[in-house]
């Protein structure tokens, strides 16, 4: 009996140590580079279970000492119930210790948004969530790979529609700090750093009014998903303190969706200046422009390849009389329906344009990968209902399709760091079941 009690005492001491360790791990998880709601919940449960089981072991030890003394105080039935409770607590503790508190939850069937990384996502490593709450989108690296620019809406902070923010990429364990570089007036979209990393460009409607421009009433268009092409959008250059130093476009109608060439000398953007939604390339030094596309349909979201020899973009190509009629009617109201888009590539001057995807649905946010040969893009083509969106890799000739991300909501806007070692993207994952879209950074694994 003495040996049995000694064993219980040792188990009790061991569990006390486990409890202390669990509390320590919980504190580490709170300040670590893994700011996950799920991880915190597991650590809390782990700690609570350890504390409870330690208490039960202590109680059991005391009761057994008394029970087996010459003056038993519990009936046999009561003792059996206590032992059953004791065993249940042990089983609970064993189950809780099966989870490692700092390991990312990888439940691929999760529907509540509390998943940071899925087991099939083999290309992502050391994933970090940078923003928490609101709608954060189109996060893009600076040329030196040290900063991100992105657009953000967060009514809780008084940001009623997208404004432009920049932030330095944090070291592991540090918080992502960011500041607004747009005027705070109107709506902004599609920010990009300049080659000197001292300025940014972005499109803004602030010259058309201080308030957020109205969102289209989709009920008037059969509840279809539509994008507004606000005529007051123009493209501006600002310093990192938010002071506008130059207005880059000034044509009537929509001018937006700008990115820069690898050498920083050319800007490709979307405009309706010639009556359709087309791509234009501007020499930032001289201001000279060239129209790149001239086919009926929306052309936008264009990027140069890392080697500067090609461009890539998303486009719609209405073909039937009904499709053409609908496209023109929406365009006349400064609207476009982005529900049927494909990925296109061409030489940097717009020659030899060719279609890469032919999946139907919405295939968009394409960029070349670091090798300037493969492409990563977002698509909902696997789902007839039009959702979710995931990211895919495809060769320039349309072969070798590979699914990269697995969230049940929205994964899009991928961009690689200049050295090709990291990827940034925006996603609905790990949002606690809300509609928040946040920014995620990960090491890229080939």
Give the ranges of each region predicted by the language model.
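Cysteine-centered motifs
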Residues: 51, 89-90
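A flexible loop/linker signature enriched in serine peptidases of the S9 family
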Residues: 132-135, 151-164, 182-188, 203-234, ...
